[in-house]
Amino acid sequence: MAFFEGIKMTGGYGKGPDIINDCSVDVNRGEIVSILGPNGAGKSTVMKAMLGLLNLKSGSVVINGKDISKLSPQDRVREGISFVPQTKNVFVGMSVEENLEMGAYLRDDNYQNIIEEIYDLFPILREKKDQLVGELSGGQRQQVALGRALMIKPTVLMLDEPTAGVSPIVMDELFDHIIKVKRTNVAILMVEQNAKQALNI
């Protein structure tokens, strides 16, 4: 049994047709699994189903042996699942550090040590911690989004097309950072269109 699993999932949006049908995905801690396919193939839908943003007609989602199929997306975050959407979802009018702090909304402890760990993973963020995110490059904004997702100390990190809209050089750098995160024993589930890049990691 894998650490994080979507098992025989079937479902769609509202009363519309099923977008995923009998789909299974699994990933273990310290592993990266990429969901590959062309636009419109349902890759992001699979991820949304595992996060609880899509109602399943059948199938289940399990983390560390616990069935979380009936949990809300917020409760799934409390179970250790973090998500970075394709839109990056950063607050451009706030500083880097303020963006990271927004990721700590579920924490009731002192999270400054976690911010320091994130700065160790993404050194450029320490250098620019007081700078507005709107002034950063696309690759740096993606690092902010990744860092914010790590503020809850997740066991599972889901990334929806993390390299969308960035240059090949920035893409390589982002994948290097994703590999660093994997080495911290996080299970990473990633939607990616670039098969070559996905297979390289």
Language-model features and meaning:
Residues 2-201:
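Glycine-rich phosphate-binding loops of nucleotide-dependent enzymes
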